[in-house]
């Protein structure tokens, strides 16, 4: 399938991408140009991106950094907390023939095959900022499709107001699920239905021009760029529509530290980290955190 890139007012120019090697490992911070080869991307339609809205809001541009660094530093709590090592453990996750169960307040519960979804929806590239609650920030080029396209197909009932997402429960593979058995596994997250239908909310199946590797949440994950990264659940196996706020992993363990909305906000300290500033790979000085991670023009109307 040809790669389709739909220009939007929130898009970043390519030179702001944090190469994959920094995103995952964040140890060396080198400024280079990220290059997509025809062999890596296949048959693509390349379109120059327009001005990125967050830049107008005062977010300074991020230099390119090599993809090789970003492939070795990541958060995937199911596989442990050693960010520079868990990518190895994540390779045990078998992602072939992956399915997603759909239930709750939906007209017809069903089982979705991810490979079919990838063929069904036009593939887009979305270059998004990703802001971790640990106060670091990167820029990632995702491949996938808007979540709203899937929601429209699933036909939720009028009473549905929220969407709950769940990941796998495989304690023999994801050892944190076994070693920290008292925690409320599997990992879950949720959005309001309005948030889930927003054009920015994305289901990613690829990154840096290739399919998602296991440590990034293969074969399909959520990306919600104006919220802290823990909202962007990885390796989704279930989607439920509900009429009540779903109980999610971190909020169920520590509701005073992790609120359900989890919108990026520089004036609200979050969990164990102050949020006024953020670390950006490749820069020595911290940057000021921007409300909604630079996407205020697009999402602020949802939070009066």
Q: Can you say where each PLM-predicted feature lies in the sequence?
A:
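Structured, non-membrane catalytic/scaffold regions adjacent to prosthetic-group chemistry
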Residues: 52-304
């Amino acid at each position: 399938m040809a790669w389709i890139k739909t220009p939007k007012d929130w898009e970043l120019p390519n030179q702001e991408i944090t190469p994959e090697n920094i995103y995952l490992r964040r140890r060396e911070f080198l400024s280079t140009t990220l290059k997509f080869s025809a062999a890596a991307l296949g048959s693509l339609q390349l379109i120059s991106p327009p001005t990125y809205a967050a830049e107008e809001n005062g977010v300074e541009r991020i230099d390119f950094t090599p993809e090789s660094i970003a492939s070795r530093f990541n958060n995937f709590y199911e596989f442990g907390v050693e960010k520079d090592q868990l990518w190895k453990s994540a390779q045990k996750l078998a992602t072939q023939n992956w399915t997603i169960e759909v239930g709750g307040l939906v007209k017809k519960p069903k089982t979705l095959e991810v490979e079919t979804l990838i063929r069904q929806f036009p593939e887009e590239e979305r270059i998004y900022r990703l802001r971790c609650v640990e106060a670091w920030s990167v820029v990632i080029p995702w491949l996938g499709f808007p979540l709203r396209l899937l929601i429209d197909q699933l036909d939720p009932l009028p009473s549905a107001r929220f969407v709950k997402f769940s990941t796998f429960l495989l304690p023999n593979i994801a050892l944190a699920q076994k070693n920290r058995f008292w925690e409320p596994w599997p990992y879950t997250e949720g959005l309001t239905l309005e948030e889930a239908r927003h054009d920015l909310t994305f289901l990613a199946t690829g990154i840096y021009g290739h399919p998602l590797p296991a440590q990034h949440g293969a074969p399909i994950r959520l990306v919600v760029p104006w919220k802290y990264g823990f909202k962007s659940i990885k390796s989704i196996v279930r989607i439920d529509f509900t009429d009540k706020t779903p109980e999610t992993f971190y909020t169920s363990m520590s509701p005073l530290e992790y609120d359900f909305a989890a919108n990026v906000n520089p004036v609200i300290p979050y969990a164990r980290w102050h949020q006024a500033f953020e670390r950006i790979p490749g820069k020595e000085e911290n940057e000021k955190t921007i409300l909604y991670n630079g996407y205020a023009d697009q999402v602020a109307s949802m939070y009066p």
